[in-house]
Amino acid sequence: MDGTPLLIVDAANVVGSRPDGWWRDRPGATARLRDTLLTVPSDGVPPELPPPVEVVLVVEGAARDVPSVPGVRVLAADHSGDDAMVELVEAHPQRRRLVVTADRELRERVTAQGAEVYGPRWLRDRDTRRRESH
């Protein structure tokens, strides 16, 4: 494997995994998710993913206009978000690729391309660990 690991986050799936009213403001919920990822490039997601890390948040639908910020590239899918994530995995075969989703079909598609898959709880647990350590 070459280069910086690539963390690909399924925004719709991760946002939708927590019943916190996201459906009232999908762009806002997606921006909040993006902001929780700001420290991943420099901190990683211990212990599984040490830094540095490239982070790509894949968005679609009502969240398409959420902008990128330094450290988190937001990719608005031209077609389906799942297809965009598979294309990202396929485009970087020499890198370690981690996809965050609970979507079973997407999990199968990206693992067939050699990616690792983690569920939304993995990211939420990271945030909980970070808050408890500060």
Question: Residues of each region from the PLM?
Answer:
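Nuclease catalytic cores that cleave nucleic-acid phosphodiester bonds
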Residues: 3-6, 14-134
